[in-house]
Amino acid sequence: MSITAVIPARYASSRFPGKPLARILGKTMIQRVYERTAQAACIDRVVVATDDSRIADVVSGFGGEVQMTRADHATGTDRLAEVTARIDTQLIVNVQGDEPLIDPHMIEAAVAPLSEDPAIPMGTLKTPLLNWQEYRDPNVVKVVTDRRGFALYFSRAPIPHPRELAVDDSAVSPASMGLFRHIGLYVYRKDFLLTFAGLPESPLERLEKLEQLRALENGYAIRVVETDRVSLGVDTPEDLVRVEAHLRGL
């Protein structure tokens, strides 16, 4: 089975312009994401998708593969779909371009169900919530799954709600109650991704600003794999300090 990882990378960012080209201990962030992604045993090919020539030049400079996209895409999924249409592959892994510490084992875990079951169109990851602050944080997306590991819902709201317990009870952790956060790494079958990108924005997607709800609202299953590995994403220049500290400690 052919599996391609695509890393969408934009130069423009309201909080951190030029983020993919930020340097982390001598390497650009996009190079670190690319190299970590390539370490996943299941990945045959890694492609950076960008609309910016500066990013393209850097990727080509370190020997990576890059494909240019249109600049008018509304979402990262649309950019991903444009590149996917040109690639001869069966599975597409969407790796975020601001995850310089992405664990290759996370990619392998997300890919496994789709490799084993051709009926699954889409997959992603979840990890236990660490504390009640995360549970209440709307920037931390929560996910609820059924007994087979398929998503029932994703939300920025604190779900599910433990009715019999105050959510600030320090004696009980959210992890001990089976509460999970979503990790934004996705795996798609190529044909499904192209179909998905062509669907109109759904009501719940519009409300929560979560693209994966478009799949659920249209009746598509999303397999969610649990992992205890968590990456450190970079949203602001201050986050670079945490990433560098982690790398120095390795």
Swiss-Prot record:
Q: Any stretches that span the bilayer, and where are they?
A: none
Name the record gives this protein: 3-deoxy-manno-octulosonate cytidylyltransferase
Which terms under GO biological process does the entry name? CMP-keto-3-deoxy-D-manno-octulosonic acid biosynthetic process; lipopolysaccharide biosynthetic process
The record's disulfide annotation reads none
| Enzyme class at the top of the EC tree | transferase
What Pfam family is a match for this entry? CTP_transf_3
The catalysed reaction is:
3-deoxy-alpha-D-manno-oct-2-ulosonate + CTP = CMP-3-deoxy-beta-D-manno-octulosonate + diphosphate
Q: Which GO terms describe its molecular function?
A: 3-deoxy-manno-octulosonate cytidylyltransferase activity
Q: Where in the cell is it found?
A: Cytoplasm
Entry-linked CDD domains:
CMP-KDO-Synthetase
Keywords assigned by UniProt?
Cytoplasm, Lipopolysaccharide biosynthesis, Nucleotidyltransferase, Transferase
Q: What does this protein do?
A: Activates KDO (a required 8-carbon sugar) for incorporation into bacterial lipopolysaccharide in Gram-negative bacteria.
Which Gene Ontology cellular-component terms appear in the entry? cytosol
**Organism in which the protein naturally occurs:** Syntrophotalea carbinolica (strain DSM 2380 / NBRC 103641 / GraBd1) (Pelobacter carbinolicus)
